[in-house]
Swiss-Prot record:
TPR repeats lie at residues 85-118, 135-168, 292-325, 326-359, 374-407, 408-441, 484-517, 626-659, 694-727, 734-767. The keyword Repeat applies. This is Cellulose synthase operon protein C. It holds the Pfam family BCSC_C.
Length: 1180
């Protein structure tokens, strides 16, 4: 722009040049020039447009060999911008054509200085080279290669010659026309020729070549547009007309061909092609007036346009009108082919070839016949394969392969047949052959991936990794599925280990691979719930429900999730969000189960509250149901009503002969009734294929155990225990693990049983994470008011076994005594106890030692230092010496106990005057709700020093030892307590009482009581009751004289007491506070003071016979008070204390106790309720 403006200004400057000093008139001319220059500045755009037009005229002149037009245009261009590289290049080409090589070289040098990187310079340099003999020779060689069909070599020669910059004009057209002969570069060549055409309008040779290339490439509209450009040129019009007509004259007769002729005639009005077109147009219009011909032509046109499916009716009409028209028959075959109707297509092509074997369309028909035969056989093979007719499918694929052995789909079909036959080797071979024939056959890639996936995920992954990117994309669903399977397997392993949070993270990754997956979301939510992340778990399922509100699968999964987290009512409500008409069988089954659960839940609440009859009535009101019938049978079985249970099971089997639950129930009844032979027969008859659930297998294992088949029971439990661990928490899996643990403990594997109880805690949803240490484990055994029966059972069973396996050491000190007469009944005693308890077999063994010190005070003496108390023989002859009466000794004992048996053997304190071996054995069991214990024993009477350890008569008298009374006998005790508000107990015992130098005696004692639980909670109980005791001793030997026993022994004793007891425990404390008020009546007969005359010296026997202990009766009130408290200091150490105050008539001493207990394994479970301090061995 600036150059153009200055040039105009220069035209108006003084003749002396720009540096000349203008005169007045010169100044005016200069100012005028400046004004004109400024005024012409906005016209720069027009000048540029004019410049372009002039350059186009230069190219037009070059193309038409109009050198005069070139000269005129260059003159004007050089006035506008003489330094424009394009202008210089055009002048360069002009001089070169004129043979002025020197002038051309000067311009080339100038162009090198002005624009050395420009295309104008590069193409000019190439043109200069071509003007040399060597350049012309190289150009001729390239042209010869192109003419003789060596296109690639020709292009290489051109590129070497042009160095990437072909000269402008005809050589550029020549070069790109040659490049267009290469199919891979045709599009590039056409684009370059179009660019040249855009800047070189009127170049007929270029436009001719470009139009032909566009038509050959199927770009007809663009080709006709170029011909329209040619038609504007008088020199190119004739050629354009000929090319145009050549493109339309052979079109099938149709409306489209008529329109094409009409469009042509609007462009051209003279010439041979125009005459021919007019005649052809007239003829086609006449033909199209015939409906049959129109249908034929329109059908053929549609087929040629690839829309044969729409032309079938028209072509059928044409064939019906002219049955010898082979072209119409062939076109109909093409139409069927395009519609995919291979069978009809084959028939039409065969017909066309038979009608016109020498038709110009023969090659096309034969090719299409081959293609359609091939794909027809492929379709038939696919259909046979889908119908699982593998032999027929194989025949079709083999026939297809014979038709065309170059296409891969017949080989692929053979691979699919081999796959269906599970012939993996053949399938792999065919699939690999398919890929060698066509690496892009994604079905073969998929077939191999699935084949390797069946063999191992690792092999499939390795195969996928070896694929190209495009092949891998074609089976990305399989790759995602493999990754999903891998993550699912890892998650399942973590779930089996109770690592719910880690499993949930893997499910998150699975959900990213398959967004919106119902069951992946379900498993993710379930694991989050188990990990304690309840809000997140619920949010996942809510989001799924929002995404798929009407999806039955979602509704079922959400209901299952809610049901699995003990939200049956919410689960049922969610199922009802979907219209029942859309419920599938899964939803129907779940809804029925949830509704049944609600009924059973109500019935169980009634039963648990003691209203079993009402519970049964509720169930019997429901529609007949196998589940309810089995529940009623189970209840009858539990209460021992085997006849009713058997009848219920028989009723179920009458409706469902193969019901395994009922069959197992009958096995259990036979076992309960002792009919082991029938039970074994029933157990053997169970259909193994139907015992699929782990709960059924659990019941089978228990039956095997009860029948004594320990090996079979072990096999069953070993099989189902890992399955139960792998399952999500459920009642079924928890029951399996609970019973497996009990079995392991019973068969001598207590430590393994404890580990299984840990798994049972997870399965019962007591904890989401398996406990890893004793403190955590035992803390989980603590009771919870919210627990159902199963959780309570798992906790208590685990606690019982753990404590049975623990080693305990207890040290206690008991101070006890009662007031009386110094020297024999004013008792003050200390007992220090040490007991070690350890596991042995299925019970606990213990070692016990008691250090006992008993002091009964001092005798009061007269002035002579003598005493005549009713002790020894002092009433016969005053005694002297041995005023202080005390004794110390140590006892030892060992024993063992389990749930049924208990025994011990030991000694009375060694060091006492009388030492004996003592002990006992007992057996406990249940008869329905009634518990009972039978016992046999030899126990000391420890209420006085005389009765327990014996005393020695004063040495001033006989010096005889006597006392040490032992009770030898047995008894039975009964109890009734179902855990409800009321309880009853009773005890009956009989003993032979004997001692060293003591008159023999015997006794019978009856004791019974009733209690009512005012508060009956897991950790707090308040009871009030009524107790009754009736005793009878044959003789009253309560005196302390020689031959007496020193123990309370009324001939009649009756008492009633009202005890009140408060027991409670907290996390680390446990206590019992209680007391009673009582009324008692007793009667004693008058008895000889010295019942054994052989112990009395002869001199005193007459006097002794005259002395008696007077009888009589008495009655009155008494009371007791008791306080006992225990504290857990650590998991291993416990301390406690107790106070027991007695104010009664039965020689019962009061106690003060302190103790400490050590647990080797540690215990963080429930505190004992009430606390269990040591009891002196003498009082067992």
């Amino acid at each position: 722009m600036r150059k153009f403006t200055l040039s105009l200004m220069h035209a108006f400057l003084p003749a002396g040049g720009r540096n000349a000093l203008p005169g007045k008139r010169g100044v005016s001319r200069a100012l005028l020039g400046l004004s004109l220059g400024m005024a012409l500045t906005p016209l720069a755009g027009a000048a540029t447009s004019a410049q372009q037009q002039l350059l186009e005229q230069v190219r037009l002149g070059e193309a038409t060999h109009r050198e005069d037009l070139v000269r005129q245009s260059l003159y004007r261009l050089e006035l506008i911008d003489p330094n424009d590289p394009q202008v210089i290049a055009a002048r360069f080409r002009y001089l070169l054509r004129q043979g002025d090589s020197d002038g051309a070289q000067k311009l080339l040098d100038r162009l090198a200085q002005l624009a050395p990187e420009s295309t104008a310079y590069q193409s000019s340099r190439t043109a200069m080279l071509l003007s040399t003999p060597q350049g012309r020779q190289s150009l001729q060689e390239a042209r010869l290669l192109a003419t003789t069909g060596h296109t690639e070599q020709a292009i290489a020669s051109y590129d070497k010659l042009f160095k990437g910059y072909p000269p402008e004009g005809e050589l550029a057209v020549e070069y790109w026309t040659t490049v267009a002969k290469l199919p891979a570069r045709r599009h590039e060549a056409i684009n370059q020729l179009q660019k040249i055409n855009a800047v070189s309008p009127g170049n007929n040779a270029l436009q001719n070549a470009l139009a032909q290339l566009l038509f050959a490439s199927g770009r007809r509209d663009e080709g006709f547009a170029v011909l329209k450009q040619m038609a504007k040129s008088s020199t190119g019009r004739s050629a354009a007309s000929a090319i145009w007509y050549q493109q339309i004259k052979d079109l099938p007769v149709s409306d489209a061909s008529v329109k094409a002729l009409q469009d042509y005639l609007t462009q051209f009005s003279e010439g041979d092609s125009v005459s021919a077109a007019r005649a052809q147009l007239s003829e086609q219009q006449k033909q199209l007036a015939d409906p049959a011909f129109r249908a034929r032509s329109q059908g053929i046109a549609a087929v040629n346009a690839g829309e044969g499916g729409k032309a079938i009716a028209q072509l059928q009409q044409a064939v019906s009108a002219r049955q010898d028209d082979s072209e119409a028959v062939g076109a109909l075959g093409q139409a069927y082919s395009q519609r995919g109707d291979r069978a009809r297509a084959v028939a039409q092509f065969e017909k066309a070839l038979a009608m016109a074997p020498h038709s110009s369309s023969r090659d096309k028909w034969e090719s299409l016949l081959k293609v359609n035969r091939y794909w027809l056989l492929i379709q038939q093979g696919d259909a046979a394969l889908k119908a699982n007719n593998l032999a027929q499918a194989e025949r079709f694929y083999q026939q297809a392969r014979a038709v065309d052995n170059t296409d891969s789909y017949a080989v692929l079909g053979l691979g699919d047949v081999a796959m269906a036959r599970k012939d993996n080797a053949a399938a792999e071979r065919y699939y690999q052959q398919t890929l060698r024939m066509d690496s892009g056959n994604t079905n073969a890639v998929r077939g191999l991936a699935n084949l390797y996936r069946q063999q191992s995920p690792q092999k499939a992954a390795a195969f996928i990794a070896s694929l190209s990117a495009s092949q891998r994309r074609s089976i990305d669903d399989i790759e995602r599925s493999l990754e999903n399977d891998r993550l699912a397997q890892q998650a399942e392993t973590l779930e089996s280990e109770g690592k719910w949070a880690q499993a949930a993270e893997l499910h998150r990754r699975r959900l990213a691979l398959d967004p919106g997956s119902v069951w992946v979301t379900y498993r993710l939510s379930r694991d989050l719930w188990q990990a304690g992340q309840h809000a997140q778990a619920d949010a996942q399922m809510r989001s799924l429900a929002q995404q798929k509100p009407n999806d039955p699968e979602q509704v079922y999964a959400y209901g299952l999730y809610l049901s699995g987290s003990d939200r049956d009512r919410a689960a049922l409500a969610h199922l009802n969000t979907l219209p029942t008409s859309q419920w599938n069988s899964n939803i129907q089954e779940l809804a029925g189960r949830l509704q049944s659960n609600q009924v059973l839940e109500s019935a169980n609440r009634l039963r648990d509250s003691g209203k079993e009859r009402e519970a049964e009535a509720l169930l019997r009101q429901q529609p007949p149901s196998t589940r309810i019938a089995l529940t009623l049978a189970d209840w009858a079985q539990q209460r021992g009503d085997n006849a009713a249970a058997r009848a219920a099971y028989d009723a179920v089997l009458a409706r469902e002969p193969g019901n395994v639950d009922a069959m197992l129930g009958r096995v259990e009844i036979d076992i309960a009734q002792g009919d082991n032979a029938a039970a074994r027969a029933q157990l053997a008859a169970l259909p193994a294929s139907q015992i699929t659930s782990i709960n059924m297998q659990r019941r089978v294992a228990l039956a095997q155990l009860q029948l004594g088949d320990i090996t079979a029971a072990a096999r069953t439990f070993n099989r189902i225990t890992p399955q139960a661990k792998a399952q999500p928490p459920s009642m079924e899996s928890a029951m399996v693990l609970r019973d497996a643990a009990a079995f392991q403990a019973q068969t001598g594997e207590p430590q393994r049983a404890l580990e299984t109880y840990k798994d049972a805690m997870v399965a019962a949803a007591i904890t989401p994470v398996r406990p890893q240490d004793n403190d955590t484990f035992t803390r989980l055994t603590r009771n919870d008011e919210k627990d159902d029966w199963l959780k309570r059972g798992v906790r208590s069973d685990a606690a019982e076994l753990y404590r049975q396996q623990d080693l305990n050491v207890t040290l206690a000190h008991d101070y006890w005594g009662s007031s009386g007469t110094g020297g024999y009944s004013d008792l003050k005693a200390h007992t220090t106890m040490l007991q070690v308890d350890a596991p042995w077999s299925d019970g606990r063994a213990f070692f016990r030692t008691d250090m006992v010190n008993m002091d009964v005070g001092r005798f009061s003496t007269d002035a002579d230092g003598k005493y005549d108390n009713n002790w020894g023989t002092c009433t016969l002859e005053k005694c002297s010496g041995h005023r202080s009466q005390a004794d110390t000794g140590a006892s030892v004992a060992v024993g063992w106990q389990n749930e049924t048996w208990r025994w011990d053997i030991g000694t009375t304190p060694m060091g006492f005057n009388v030492v004996d071996v003592v002990g006992g054995v007992s057996y406990s069991d249940d008869i329905g709700p009634l518990g009972y214990t039978l016992n046999a024993h030899r126990r000391p009477i420890s209420s006085s020093l005389l009765a327990f350890g014996g005393q020695k008569d004063a040495s001033s008298n006989t010096g005889t030892k006597w006392g040490g009374v032992r009770a030898n006998g047995g008894g039975v005790s009964l109890s009734y307590d179902k855990g409800e508000a009321n309880g009853v107990w009773a005890s009956l015992s009989g003993d032979q009482l004997s001692g060293k130098n003591v008159e023999d005696n015997w006794r019978v004692r009856w004791m019974t009581g009733y209690y009512y639980k005012v508060i009956n909670e897991n950790n707090r109980r308040v009871t009030v009751g009524l107790n009754n005791m009736i005793w009878h001793y044959d003789k009253d030997l309560s005196g302390y004289s020689l031959g007496q026993g020193g123990y309370y022994s009324p001939q009649e004793y009756l008492s009633f007491a009202v005890p009140v007891m408060w027991r409670q425990r907290t996390e680390n404390w446990s206590w019992e506070l209680g007391g009673s008020v009582s009324w008692s009546h007793s009667r004693n007969r008058t008895m000889p003071r010295y019942p054994l005359m052989n112990l009395i010296p002869a001199d005193y026997q007459e006097d002794a016979r005259d002395q008696t202990n007077g009888g009589g009766s008495s009655q009155g009130f008494g009371y007791t008070a008791r306080a006992l408290i225990e504290r857990r200091v650590t998991a291993n150490w416990f301390v406690g204390t107790a106070v027991d105050i007695q104010q009664a008539k039965d020689y019962t001493p009061s106690h003060l106790l302190l103790y400490v207990r050590y647990s080797a394994a540690g215990w963080q479970g429930d505190m004992d309720l009430p606390p269990q301090p040591l009891v002196p061995y003498a009082d067992w």
